[in-house]
């Protein structure tokens, strides 16, 4: 059913070494959380800008895939303007409606005058082969699509997979948080900080045009 598909690598570096396949991956949520929120001088609503800026300074023009949903994709797109949209080869979906997200990113590239076919949309949220194929059929003629499928492939037993997510909750003695595109997936030990971060994002979305 998937004859035109191929495995290009794994994010598990041990398996990549063992089976001599390419290690692949993207930046982590923790990178954006700590770079943007682990400094008291930074407005946390600009976390993506600080993280993207530091990433580009380190890697130049070989920047790979950017992660969009650390403090919501809408806030990410405020910072993912022409320079970063050009320098990064694509973006990764990890929460929220993947079909709505894909349409939003294609529209974003087009608004910047960038041909979406030159960019990659990497989907990685709770995928199986059938869902990945539906996404592929939806977007394949407009953009390059790729998929990160973990639990469905790795949990090949009859047992229900455990839902284990590990995220940073503090950096440099400061609270940090992830506010994704899926309501209720916030991750932080300090509810007051989550409220503060949410208000910062809301203010920016309303005032930063």
What is each PLM-predicted segment?
Residues 73, 96-119, 124-209:
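Gly/Ser/Thr/Ala-enriched C-terminal appendages of enzymes
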Residues 1-104, 108-109, 139, 170-174:
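Buried, small/hydrophobic-residue-enriched core segments of structured protein domains
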